[in-house]
Amino acid sequence: RIPHEPVHWDQDVTYDPLADAGKPARVAELIHAFRQRGHLAADTDPLAYRLRRHPDLNFSSYGLSLWDLDRVFPTGGLGGKDRATLREILQMLRDAYSRYVGVEYMHIQDPAQRRWWQERMEGVTPSIDTAERRRILTKLMQAEAFEVFLQTKYVGQKRFSLEGGESLIVLLDRLIDDAAHDGIEEAAIGMAHRGRLNVLTNIAGKSYGQVFDEFDGNYLTNGQGSGDVKYHLGTTGTFTGTDDVTTKVSLAANPSHLETVDGVLEGIVRAKLDRSGSGADGSYNVLPILVHGDAAFAGQGVVYEVLNMSQLPGYHTGGTIHVIVNNQIGFTTGNALGRSTTYPSDLAKGLQVPIFHVNGDAPESVARVA
């Protein structure tokens, strides 16, 4: 497949000095358009049958033609260059904003924050070394092997698998690993039932034996109460990252009411911060992570209620990382019938936060975003 709109033939036999004088301004408009809407052409959907395109990202929409591709224009600092050919400018913009990662940050009102994100998106992408690639592969294999075993051993039992979204394990692994190296003492995770068993074993440290006992019906007999289904349960364990760095990981219990855990997890984290005295000086030792489904994030009011409390002094936790696993369906409801927005994450724009869209079939890009 051709990843972008083909360049069409155009005559270039006339000379218009006024039109040529305005081309640098039109190139600047093109650069701004990619920063603002490049995500609309990014290859972020593993199931896409049609390539995503947008007229604002086609240079011909700005009066530029194929004859301008090798002409030099000012870039305004794009990619660390003051001047570049239109061909080079397009390559840098597509690499930054329209490959496997799409990013939305131009809605942020603070110019300094926008520049910060701009520099990181348009700078040189650090390469992933062999050791990191091996860790990514290991995590993917662990996630897939776990699901395949459960499917084979416990046929017909409910488990709400992570199949198709195994790169979530790569994302959480990289997030918590980096956080542990930066001094975070605990990662607190809240999520619904989809993929919970995989996260319990491959991230939160619950043993495979414990999970298999629950499938076999071997529960502890010395407790009181009726218990709960295995994909509602939480745990507390130890995460081991690169260089043998460790940190505590807690996964909060959650019923089948999807986003119920959101406010509960924020309360848990705030209580931990208050008890430890963290946060008063602007540093936080607990990292909250919430994992959502696409339909639930867009459709359940508790999500926005929790987001709306994020900047209030009485509820602030230093920032929460929200991960949306986009299955492109809400039980039996398709995207077109489940929300009125382009993305399930669109409601988060009101909080001035950057939003990343990444192709789940590109695990290295998932790790880079993390």
Model region roles, listed by residue range:
Residues A145, F149-G209:
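Active-site pocket-lining segments that scaffold enzyme catalytic pockets across diverse folds
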Residues I2, I31, I89, I108, ...:
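Weak global preference for isoleucine
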Residues G22-E29, A42, A84, E88, ...:
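Generic recognition of stable, solvent-exposed alpha-helical segments in well-folded globular domains
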Residues A188-G360:
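Cofactor-binding active-site loop characterized by glycine-rich and histidine/acidic residues
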Residues I31-R35, L93-V101, R120-T125, M141-E144, ...:
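Structural signal for hydrophobic packing residues in well-ordered secondary-structure cores
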Residues R1-L168, I184:
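Extended, charge-enriched "interface" segments that sit outside catalytic cores
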Residues P46, R50-R53, G63, D68-D70, ...:
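A generic structural micro-environment signature
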